[in-house]
Amino acid sequence: MASAVLSASRVSRPLGRALPGLRRPMSSGAHGEEGSARMWKALTYFVALPGVGVSMLNVFLKSRHEEHERPPFVAYPHLRIRTKPFPWGDGNHTLFHNPHVNPLPTGYEDE
């Protein structure tokens, strides 16, 4: 029994030295990573940086756009229902209330 194990190890040892990449063929480390860094560098230069540039252009063009008029207030019965007051402030304003954009149940505060 011991001689069979010894002979098997003698046969497998040279194979392991000759083919180191085939030792664990299903592991993720078996594949070469020489192209991985080059791929991520190319993605950074050709996808990410132009994407940031397009986003900056979009913000610039939107900032130069004229202001729109506020739509007239229509008191729809299914919107802005207050069954109990909010636990902050006067209880009628939402947490991130903007008086120029968000109307109260009675209308805009500015009008």
From Swiss-Prot:
* Membrane-protein topology: Single-pass membrane protein
GO biological processes: oxidative phosphorylation
Q: Name one GO cellular component term.
A: mitochondrial inner membrane
Q: Where in the cell is it found?
A: Mitochondrion inner membrane
Main location per UniProt? mitochondrion
Knockout consequences? Mice have walking difficulties. Histologic examination shows thinned sciatic nerves and neurogenic muscular changes, including small angular fibers and small group atrophy. Electrophysiologic studies show delayed motor nerve conduction velocities compared to controls. COX activity and ATP contents in liver cells are decreased.
Q: What ranges does the Mitochondrial matrix topological domain annotation cover?
A: 27-36
> Looking at the keywords, is Transit peptide present?
yes
Instruction: Specify the transit peptide boundaries.
Output: 1-26
* Keywords, ordered alphabetically: Membrane, Mitochondrion, Mitochondrion inner membrane, Oxidoreductase, Transit peptide, Transmembrane, Transmembrane helix
Q: List the disulfide bonds.
A: none
User: What pathway is this protein a component of?
Assistant: Energy metabolism; oxidative phosphorylation
> Which residue stretches are annotated as topological domain Mitochondrial intermembrane?
62-111
Q: Which domain of life is it from?
A: Eukaryota
> Pfam families per the record?
COX6A (PF02046)
Regions crossing the membrane? 37-61
Entry keyword annotation includes Methyltransferase: no
Give the Gene Ontology MF terms in alphabetical order.
oxidoreductase activity
What the record says about family reads:
Belongs to the cytochrome c oxidase subunit 6A family.
What is its quaternary makeup? Component of the cytochrome c oxidase (complex IV, CIV), a multisubunit enzyme composed of 14 subunits. The complex is composed of a catalytic core of 3 subunits MT-CO1, MT-CO2 and MT-CO3, encoded in the mitochondrial DNA, and 11 supernumerary subunits COX4I, COX5A, COX5B, COX6A, COX6B, COX6C, COX7A, COX7B, COX7C, COX8 and NDUFA4, which are encoded in the nuclear genome.
Task: Describe the function of this protein.
Answer: Component of the cytochrome c oxidase, the last enzyme in the mitochondrial electron transport chain which drives oxidative phosphorylation. The respiratory chain contains 3 multisubunit complexes succinate dehydrogenase (complex II, CII), ubiquinol-cytochrome c oxidoreductase (cytochrome b-c1 complex, complex III, CIII) and cytochrome c oxidase (complex IV, CIV), that cooperate to transfer electrons derived from NADH and succinate to molecular oxygen, creating an electrochemical gradient over the inner membrane that drives transmembrane transport and the ATP synthase.
Q: What is this protein called?
A: Cytochrome c oxidase subunit 6A1, mitochondrial
